């Protein structure tokens, strides 16, 4: 294996030098998303320096994808993280970032323990785009920035308005974001004492209870059960979910 690599890697390096920066970025993304992503480190060690040397050839979006792919592969690349952080401070480069990319950036820098590098730039950007956030972006943001309560509440309040039109998948993501961001307050055992957002989510579950798939119901139960703050809401879920609820809670208990 080692002797073969000694022959192959210089040729690979030579081949990679002929590709465009965007194509190299796409290769890295493919490696990160491959199911057997115990990606060959030798190939990555050849590909990543090439990507770094072509940094200025690609857009900020591709550079974000590069650090995202490396983070997926559990690789922290300080120089690339710094260069992306520097570019994010550049108003013209950062102006076209979508909420999806903003959430992706937050995920990358939190996972790499480097949120301080970008927080001053990203928080105002996210705030000014709050109205454009969809449920999936909101859920990802709430998972990585649960401490940014004011910001998350701003997005949740805007999404709350569209709750009646949400499909189940979007509702699950919205609910996940509300649970992670601890936005469902107050939570009382009786209906009258609950906050409007809490009651609206429970009401959605009641109205759509027959349309939820079993695995979706299980996700809601898992989510609430594992949240110290909202564990009590499991009892407020629709009665028709009781059998699934009991099975799921038994399974959680058995797993210990």
Regions found by a protein language model. Give the residues of each.
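Eukaryotic RNA-binding helical-repeat scaffolds
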Residues: 1-256
């Amino acid at each position: 294996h080692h002797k073969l690599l000694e022959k192959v890697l210089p040729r690979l390096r030579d081949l990679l030098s002929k590709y465009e920066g965007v194509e190299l970025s796409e290769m890295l993304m493919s490696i990160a998303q491959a199911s057997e992503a115990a990606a060959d480190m030798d190939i990555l060690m050849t590909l990543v320096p090439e990507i770094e040397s072509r940094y200025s050839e690609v857009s900020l979006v591709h550079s974000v994808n590069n650090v995202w792919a490396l983070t997926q592969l559990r690789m922290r690349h300080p120089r690339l993280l710094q260069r992306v952080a520097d570019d994010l401070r550049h108003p013209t480069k950062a102006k076209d970032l979508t909420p999806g990319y903003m959430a992706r950036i937050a995920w990358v820098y939190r996972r790499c323990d480097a949120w301080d590098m970008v927080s001053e730039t990203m928080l105002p950007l996210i705030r000014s785009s709050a109205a454009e956030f969809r449920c999936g972006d909101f859920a990802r943001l709430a998972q990585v920035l649960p401490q940014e309560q004011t910001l998350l509440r701003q997005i949740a309040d805007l999404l709350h308005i569209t709750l009646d039109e949400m499909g189940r998948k979007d509702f699950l993501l919205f609910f996940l974001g509300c649970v992670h961001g601890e936005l469902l307050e107050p939570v009382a055992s009786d209906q009258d004492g609950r906050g409007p957002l809490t009651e609206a989510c429970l009401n959605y579950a009641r109205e759509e209870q027959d349309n939820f798939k079993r695995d979706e119901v299980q996700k809601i139960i898992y989510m609430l059960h594992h949240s110290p703050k909202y564990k009590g809401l499991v009892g407020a879920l629709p009665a028709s979910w009781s059998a699934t609820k009991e099975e799921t809670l038994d399974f959680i208990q058995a797993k210990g």
